């Protein structure tokens, strides 16, 4: 039986978390963009972690829902056929399954994410 009283795993400070090199961003549409991250928890369908990426343009078509909370940096997200919106530190967004559009990362971005 799973102990639901324990709070694990735990990350005290997403801004200071040590990240692993995750290599180049496959979704990049310009110069290569480098990513790093830390997976806090995953179960095969859902995942929680910290992700960081260098500046540049990218294009996404999401196959899952994604919740993001920006820790540092800023980017402009533009859904296909929609309006651009800038997201920066302290802001939160949800990208529903099927969301498609571009992310223009202006400054190295670090986000806490939940894929579900």
List the predicted regions and their residue ranges.
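Short acidic-glycine-tyrosine-enriched beta hairpin
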Residues: 81-97
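Conserved hydrophobic/aromatic beta-strand scaffold that supports enzyme active sites
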Residues: 48-50, 67, 92
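Short, conserved beta-strand element in jelly-roll/cupin
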Residues: 53, 62-77
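A short hydrophobic beta-strand segment most commonly corresponding to one strand
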Residues: 94, 107-116
């Amino acid at each position: 039986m799973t102990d639901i009283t324990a709070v694990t795993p735990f990350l005290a400070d997403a801004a200071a978390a040590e990240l692993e090199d995750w290599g180049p961003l496959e979704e990049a549409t310009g110069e290569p963009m480098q990513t790093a991250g830390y997976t806090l928890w995953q179960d095969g369908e859902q995942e929680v972690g910290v992700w960081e990426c260098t500046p540049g343009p990218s294009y996404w078509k999401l196959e899952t829902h994604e919740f993001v909370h920006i820790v540092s940096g800023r980017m402009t997200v533009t859904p296909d056929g929609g309006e651009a919106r800038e997201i920066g530190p302290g802001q939160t967004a949800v990208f529903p399954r099927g969301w498609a559009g571009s992310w223009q990362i202006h400054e190295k971005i670090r986000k806490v994410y939940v894929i579900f």
